[in-house]
From Swiss-Prot:
It comes from the Bacteria. Part of an ATP-driven transport system TP_0034/TP_0035/TP_0036 for a metal. Probably responsible for energy coupling to the transport system. It is a peripheral membrane protein. This is Probable metal transport system ATP-binding protein TP_0035. GO terms for molecular function: ATP binding; ATP hydrolysis activity. Keywords: ATP-binding, Cell inner membrane, Cell membrane, Membrane, Nucleotide-binding, Transport. Residues 10-231 form the ABC transporter domain. It comes from Treponema pallidum (strain Nichols). It is found in: Cell inner membrane. InterPro entries: AAA+_ATPase (IPR003593), ABC_transporter-like_ATP-bd (IPR003439), Metal_Ion_Import_ABC (IPR050153), P-loop_NTPase (IPR027417). ATP binds at residues 44-51.
Length: 238
């Protein structure tokens, strides 16, 4: 498929979404232009529409209104839920090699290459269900790299991982963003990581989105939240 030339990886225009015609809208008239090579963190409260936005970008859902245009050829993803892998006695290598065959990639060496890239080549003979949360995330990132993606989409990457593991994961992801020039879209609940690693932050609140850079996010949203928290505390003390 021929991809039109564009400075953007993904372009959302006036995108709204609801599951049925009589249901409430989860996303409301979202406009979002994601430049190629960007590292975009999607943040917001639970239920604000973050995972829905990711599913729309991955074409797992269709927008109720508006359009989503992709200007990249290959998309990799790391899902939030990975439990299905834990029920099968596969080694790390077997799991990734199965995915390589699914993508019809002929070169077997790519499995070792992506494991090396994420620092997990020494674990290729380990059973997947024996891995720690951080190790499993690295394996799934390696899996997403097998198809040499132009766009990498991740949903709550740091969930269930200790602070040291999170630090390793974010360093890896930032390195991939730089070395491969891969565009990253990451649903994020770790605000410190979003502010530190992102080139852009997309803040969702009740289905409405606002795009800003990390510095703007700190001044416009975090400071506002601190002021609200202080006001609430003062009310309770009266």
């Amino acid at each position: 498929m021929r991809i039109m030339a564009s400075p953007f990886a993904v372009l959302l225009q006036n995108v709204s979404f609801r599951y049925t015609a009589d249901a409430r809208f989860i996303l409301h008239e979202v406009d979002l232009a994601i430049p190629k090579g960007a590292y975009l963190s999607v943040v917001g409260e639970n239920g604000s529409g973050k995972s829905t936005l990711v599913k729309l970008v991955l074409k797992l859902l269709k927008p109720s209104t508006g359009t989503i245009a992709h200007f990249v050829q290959r998309v990799g993803s790391v899902p939030q839920t990975k439990m299905h892998t834990l029920y099968f006695p596969l080694t790390v290598y077997e799991m990734l090699n199965s995915y390589r065959r699914l993508l019809r990639i002929s070169h077997k060496w790519v499995v070792d290459a992506v494991l090396e890239e994420v620092g997990m080549r020494g674990a290729k003979k380990k059973l997947v269900y024996t891995l720690s949360g951080g190790e499993l995330q690295k394996v799934y990132i390696a899996r997403s790299l097998i198809g040499d993606p132009d766009l990498l989409v991740l949903d709550e990457l740091s969930t269930g991982i200790d602070s040291r593991g999170q630090k390793d994961i974010y360093a890896l992801l930032k390195g991939l963003n730089t070395s491969r020039n891969v565009t990253v879209i990451s649903v994020e609940h770790n605000l410190d990581a979003a502010i530190t690693n992102s080139t852009q932050i997309f803040h969702l609140s009740e289905g409405h989105g606002h795009l800003c850079n990390p510095q703007q996010y700190v001044s416009e949203f975090l400071d506002m939240q601190k002021k609200d928290a202080l006001a609430c505390a003062q009310c309770r003390s009266r």
